[in-house]
UniProtKB/Swiss-Prot annotation:
This is Fluoride-specific ion channel FluC 3. It is a multi-pass membrane protein. It comes from Bifidobacterium longum (strain NCC 2705). The keyword Protein biosynthesis does not apply. InterPro entries: FluC. Belongs to the fluoride channel Fluc/FEX (TC 1.A.43) family. Keywords: Cell membrane, Ion channel, Ion transport, Membrane, Metal-binding, Sodium, Transmembrane, Transmembrane helix, Transport. The gene is fluC3. It is found in: Cell membrane. GO terms for cellular component: plasma membrane. Fluoride-specific ion channel. Important for reducing fluoride concentration in the cell, thus reducing its toxicity. Na(+) is not transported, but it plays an essential structural role and its presence is essential for fluoride channel function. GO terms for biological process: cellular detoxification of fluoride.
Length: 121
C-alpha cells in the first residue's frame, strides 16, 4: 500500500470535498439565515470523525495508512475551516456582529468538543 498511499489520500480528499459540497448544497436549500449552518455542521461532523479516527488509531484498530487515508485524505477534503474564517469576515463586513461573534466562538469550540466526543465513543 506504500506506493499507492499518496494516490489514495488524494482520491479520498476528492471524495471528502465532494461530500462537503453535497452536504453544503443540501443544508443551504433548507437554511437561509445569516448564520452559516452548513459550514458549521460540516466542521462539527469532521471534528467528531477526526476524534473517532484518532481513537481507533490509538487503540490499534486502525493502521497508520488507513488513518492517513481517512484523516488527511477524506476529512482533509471534507472539513472546511478556511471557509468558516471567510464567512466570519463576511458577517463582520455586513455588520452582523452578534452573529459573527457567536459563529466565531461556536466554530472554534464545538468541533473540539465533537472531536473529544468522537474520541470517547
Amino acid at each position: 500500500m506504500t506506493v499507492f498511499l499518496p494516490i489514495l489520500v488524494c482520491l479520498c480528499g476528492g471524495v471528502g470535498a465532494s461530500c462537503r459540497y453535497l452536504l453544503d448544497v443540501t443544508i443551504k436549500t433548507y437554511w437561509q439565515r445569516a448564520f452559516p449552518l452548513s459550514t458549521f455542521t460540516i466542521n462539527l461532523i469532521a471534528g467528531f470523525l477526526a476524534g473517532l479516527v484518532a481513537a481507533l488509531a490509538l487503540g490499534g484498530t486502525l493502521d497508520e495508512p488507513w488513518r492517513l487515508v481517512l484523516a488527511t485524505g477524506f476529512l482533509g477534503g471534507f472539513s472546511t475551516f478556511s471557509t468558516a474564517i471567510n464567512e466570519m469576515v463576511t458577517l463582520f463586513r455586513k455588520h452582523r456582529y452578534p452573529t459573527a461573534a457567536a459563529y466565531l466562538v461556536l466554530s472554534l469550540g464545538v468541533p473540539v468538543v465533537a472531536a473529544a466526543c468522537g474520541f470517547l465513543v
